[in-house]
Amino acid sequence: MNSLLMITTCLILIGTVLAEDGYLFDKRKRCTLECIDKTGDKNCDRNCKNEGGSFGKCSYFACWCKGLPGITPISRTPGKTCKI
């Protein structure tokens, strides 16, 4: 029982450490996902959750996500935006 609890705790911690926050980034087009402040929150949230994030919102005309897996391409700044 203690082993199961310890393994579960480790998996939760690993998931928390490997999660990243940032702007969704399209490597092929080399740009961040475009949105319109406030009205784009639903689309950003949906796109972020599709990529494995916990939630997303529109910030500086680009989709910002929280809790993305470490393998998801992100940008730390909004930069050049594009429609994906």
UniProtKB/Swiss-Prot annotation:
GO terms, molecular function: sodium channel inhibitor activity; toxin activity
One GO CC term on file: extracellular region
Main subcellular localisation: secreted
SUPFAM superfamilies: Scorpion toxin-like
Bridged cysteine pairs (disulfide): C31-C82, C35-C58, C44-C63, C48-C65
Keywords linked to the UniProt accession: Disulfide bond, Ion channel impairing toxin, Neurotoxin, Secreted, Signal, Toxin, Voltage-gated sodium channel impairing toxin
InterPro entries membership: LCN-type_CS_alpha_beta_dom, Scorpion_toxin-like_sf, Scorpion_toxinL, Scorpion_toxinL/defensin
Domain LCN-type CS-alpha/beta: 20-83
Localisation: Secreted
Signal sequence region: 1-19
Tissue expression from the record: Expressed by the venom gland.
Superkingdom assignment: Eukaryota
Record function comment: Beta toxins bind voltage-independently at site-4 of sodium channels (Nav) and shift the voltage of activation toward more negative potentials thereby affecting sodium channel activation and promoting spontaneous and repetitive firing.
Record's protein name: Toxin CsE9
